[in-house]
Every structure is written in structure tokens, then in C-alpha cells.
Amino acid sequence: MREPINVSGMVLSASPVGEYDKRVVILTRELGKITAFARGARRMKSPLMAVSNPFVFGEFQVYEGRDSYTLSGANIKEYFLDLAQMQPGVYYGFYFLELAEYFGQEGNDETQMLNLLYVTMNAIRRGKQDLRLIRCIFELRTITISGEAPQMFSCMECGTKENLTVFSLRDSAIYCQNCGKTIRDPWALQPGTVLACRYIIAAPLAKLYGFTVNEEILDELERLLRAYLHRYVEKKMKTLQILDVMK
């Protein structure tokens, strides 16, 4: 019999299989995104019932199979049970899990994404930031981790770091006011929006959720991220549809 593999991760999604089993998707540090089957997890007295739910974060023991893994046990660090009582916060949380599942890859080092999920769920439960801003931060940082961050630190054309006020969605880059006159799809941005994007892209994870913006900047940041994310996410997110209805 194969030895169990210990992995650190978070359950991104769970769905019923058969009469008593569950299929779970776990984002792990060691193996990237994996699919595992929790046998008997839907039985009332199963030790796997509580550990095979979305948001659960900790150490999991799995056995590798031909096409998937089998979940055999877990040592949970955080269940995030209080998120279920936070509305609409919990729906934002489910959206972040779905986005992480979309970008996650099997065999990749997903440490950054896993850490981002953990601090983001804690940001939701603290309740100190506008959930719309938390969403913008998570989306842009996720894109950054995936290697598709926009160039926001110098003009794409001349390289200057001054007067960066024109964004090109087509080029995924910022331009100075002068060079921006020549691009096909100029999108005028306020300096505060550019600064917010820079901070989200480069800030240490521990300080990522340590800032706020005014309503005008937040509105612009939302519009920018909606358009930018549309370029990289081909799937229609079910949880995003719920968030849109709640607006």
C-alpha cells in the first residue's frame, strides 16, 4: 500500500459523489491544485465531514491514485466558519475560491496563491475594508501571481515614471500623458488609481490589505479590473453572477 502524502492547503470546492462521498478540489503548496475523493464524507459520523468543505485550511493526508487522490485525514488550522455568518462577505469568499481554482494548476508551486487566499479570508472577517476594494485587491494580485500583471511603473513607450495617466488595455500597460496621445485605446486614469495598482502588485503580503481609497478611486479601480480580468478569464464565474445580483 502506498504511503500517504502530507500537503498544506485550502479546500476550494466540494461536490457530492454517489450516496456518501465527496469530490474536493484542494490548492496545495506541495502539489498545486489537486482533486481528491473523500470516501464516506457525507456520513454523519465521518471524520472527513468537517474537513472536506470550502474554506477549510490546514494539513491534509492524501493517497495518490491514477487520476486523482483519496483524502484520508486532516489536521485543520482554520475552518473560517464565521464567514458563513458574514453576508455578503461569504459570497466574496466563494468568488475568490472559484478564481483561485480557475488559475490554479496541478504540479505548480501555489504557495503565493495559497497565502493570498489565507490573508484575504482574514481581511473579510476583520471587516475593516470595503468588500469591493478587497475584491479589486484579490483580483489584481491573483493576476500578478499568474504572471499577467499590467505594466504600471513606467511608460511603456518612453520609460518615464512621471505623469503616468493613460492606460492601454490592449497593451496591458500604462503610458505617460504625452505618449498616451498616440495609442489606439487610451483610458485616462487618476494618479490615485495608478498608485493603488502599483501597491497591490508590489506590496508585501502582510501589508496588502492595509490601505483604503476614496469612492471615486474605488469606482475607477473596479471598472479597470473588470475589463482587465475579462481578458484573462474565459469562464463565466457562477459566484460572480451572484455578486452582480447583490449589487
Could you say what each language-model-derived stretch is?
Residues M1-K247:
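Non-catalytic alpha-helical scaffolds and adjoining flexible linkers that form interface surfaces
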